[in-house]
Design a protein with these regions (language model features):
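Small/aliphatic-rich secondary-structure junction motif
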Residues: 1-51, 150-216, 236
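Structural motif
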Residues: 35, 84-86, 119, 139, ...
Length: 256
């Protein structure tokens, strides 16, 4: 791992993400690119004449000063930190910055509720995930002093298009020193599969991925509940969910 992107907005949650990113950067000897979206409305930008260009420059400088102060953290010492400022709140730019700097990982904070759907669907996080080919690590909940995940759950529908995501998850688990647990959530209704059919599908997927790993089939009422309950069962520290291109994560929770 050579470079990590972490978008920040000065919130407590984004600082938690920054701490995790710093911990990973230090452990992996990676460069940390800290991205701040300095949002300026058309009025502030001067397009409607409500504010002078001098005032625009002043506001930009204030934002840059606040960003600089935010990065004055003891846990960022001895890490190569490159601040990046964008003047528009366009979340696709996160993916563009990641591509420009050949990032191996994007780390983001989330203020989502307890459920997985509330964290992802329609959120800023999903906007980034949907436009990024780079793995996105979402940090939520309590402060994380030492990011050292022991158990990493990868939940998938085991469709062929998820093969690249599994390979990235496997590589990430190896980098983090985590044990990777693969799980298929089997739910009632139209999506229900017999054990034999499910294992046939999974076996075909693993052959395609050229990965020799065990997969657990976990039954639950919804995919979301299944992922959470399985993760609790094994004491997971990290959950990985593949996205399918522009559809983002919504397909994963359909009907749940």
């Amino acid at each position: 791992m050579k470079s990590i992107i972490v978008p920040v907005d000065f919130s407590n949650q984004s600082e938690k993400a920054l701490k995790v990113a710093a911990s990973l950067a230090k452990e992996q000897n990676a460069e940390l690119f800290v991205l701040h979206m300095l949002e300026l409305s058309p009025a502030i930008m001067g397009e409607s004449g409500y504010i002078s260009q001098e005032q625009v420059v002043h506001l930009i400088k204030l934002g840059e000063k606040r960003f600089s102060d935010f990065l004055d953290k003891p846990y960022l010492k001895d890490i190569t930190v490159t601040p990046v400022i964008k003047h528009y709140k366009v979340f696709s730019e996160v993916a563009e910055v990641a591509e420009k700097h050949k990032a191996d990982l994007i780390v983001m904070g989330s203020n989502g509720a307890d459920g997985l759907q509330e964290i992802f669907i329609g959120s800023n996080t999903e906007r980034v995930v949907r436009t990024s080919d780079v793995p996105v690590l979402v940090i939520k909940g309590n402060e994380v002093d030492n990011f050292n995940p022991k158990n990493f759950v990868f939940a998938s529908d085991f469709e062929e298009e998820s093969v690249p995501a599994l390979k990235k998850a496997k590589k990430m688990a190896e980098l983090l020193g985590s044990k990777l647990h693969l799980v298929y959530i089997n739910t009632p209704g139209d999506e229900f599969m017999s054990t034999n059919d499910a294992y046939a599908k999974i076996s075909k997927f693993l052959d395609e991925a050229n990965v020799g790993m065990e997969v657990e089939i976990f039954n639950d009422y919804t995919v979301e509940k299944g992922v959470i309950n399985f993760s609790k069962k094994i004491g997971a520290d990290l959950i990985g969910i593949p996205t399918h291109g522009r559809r983002g994560l919504s397909h994963f929770f359909m009907g749940s």
